[in-house]
Amino acid sequence: GSDHSAKTTQMKVGAMIVAMNQSTSGSPSAFQLLFDARLNKGAAFSESEREQFGLVGLIPDGIESMDIQLDRARLQFEQQSSDLGKYQFLSALQDRQERLFYALLRSDFQRYMPIVYTPTVGEACQKFGHIMRRPKGMYLSMNRRGKLAQVLRNWPVKDVRFIVVTDGERILGLGDQGVCGMGIPIGKLALYTACAGVPPQVALPVVLDMGTNNEGFRNDPLYPGLRVPRIGGDEYLSFIDEFVAAVQEVFPRCCIQFEDFTNKNAIPLLERYRDKVCCFNDDIQGTASVAVAGLFGACRMNATKMSDQRILFMGAGSAAVGIADLFVKQLCGDGMSEAQAIERCWFVNSRGMVHAGMPKLPDYLQRYAHDVSGLKFPVGAPSGLDSPLTRLSDVVEVVRPTASIGVSTVAHAFNETVVRAMARINARPIIFPLSNPTSKSEATPIDLYRWTNEKALVATGSPFSPIVSDGGMVRIGQCNNSFIFPGVGLGVIASGACRVIDSMFTAAAEV
């Protein structure tokens, strides 16, 4: 009775929508032109286009230039009262008129990038289930195991060239965001187009839904993903294997960018696939490239060489090790032995200074676990043999680094004592607090300048406002992956590369 009637009505409505979306001439219909973000030009359609495609009367008669549309978009953007509101406005604009969206981003990168990407994208992920309007990208659930290739074929574009994929387990420094981590692939791919001109139609954001350990999300009725604990171990790896194989089958010319996977998975997954398929991990290789580029810049500013640097990493995860590995490769390329280069990299993790004999170190850290028996330790500090140094200021005194790089997501880890020690040891200390978002940064630029009498060479992971000093306005260098991965992606597409190799990232760092 009523169920049958409802289904019949739904079928009729569906048929009507299909009919509206069809054009007898084979050209796009008015419906398609106005509701497909990649075709819609709004009031910029010319008179002849309006006549040809049946748009007369569907939009106001005034024909607008792109400049006029940009003025309106800027006005509407600035009318939003919060950064999250601005993010939602840009997201809606991308859904409605893609060409205008990218024109707006390109018109003022400094203004719009912190909204479409870090730091605002972090808040957008945390509230994704509450602000989600129109789905973007693909959500591949573990409930579809054995059918991932079939699911990927549902994507309407058949020649996808770039996928940014996350499992949502470690979004920026915010932890497990589940499928709400989709904001990261969306934001990354927006920058591929805005910064490097990669056609948006060949890019696909993907989130792998393997559950979430975020209890707040599991109890939230508006959370759009699976409300179950995460899978792990062989079950997890099998799902990733199926995804990678499905991409190769459905989109054989596609490069995969792994994004925001946890430390325990990021490096093993990269090692598992890097020599088999076209892929890279931006958190490891992209971060490394932009950090090494920052070191090159710092060397130019203080008239030193890369081989003069001794780096202390606050944080010992995949990002830190990625930077160290690329730094070592750079030094080896300049003629230094690998052993000598490794000796210039020191790490502090959640248990203290990493050293030989420290238990339960992951394999990727073993080569950076130095023998510390010959080092001079501060009076009253642990020897480092039986127990590690846990105070960062003590580690600075022992290691005497020329550069400190923060990738720990521990806010204010570079405190006044640490920074003043760096300034005492070095005429111009290199200090890079790279953790995202801004709330997780190891220090603020204004503190770094104040504690070093404006001698510090600073670059940050998230954007900070310029500093007014006695010498004038100081713009804070941003050491963000967005300066690297769009160009690498465009290079992969343009060259038809079948693998992404480390020398691509060293070359990018040197440019």
Q: At which residue positions do the language-model features occur?
A:
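Glycine-rich phosphate/diphosphate-binding loop of Rossmann-like nucleotide-binding domains
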Residues: K276-V277, N281-A403
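Extreme N-terminal basic, low-complexity initiation segments
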Residues: S2-T9
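N-terminal Rossmann-like NAD(P) cofactor-binding subdomain of oxidoreductases
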Residues: A356, D386, V398, V407-H412, ...
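N-terminal ligand-binding/catalytic initiation module
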Residues: I17-C278
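Adenosine-phosphate binding glycine-rich loop
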Residues: L39-N40, D282-G286, N302, P429, ...
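Short acidic, glycine/serine/threonine-rich loops at helix termini
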Residues: V151-L152, G173-I184, E215-L222, A266-R272, ...
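Rossmann-fold NAD(P) dinucleotide-binding segment
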Residues: R391-R400, T409-I430
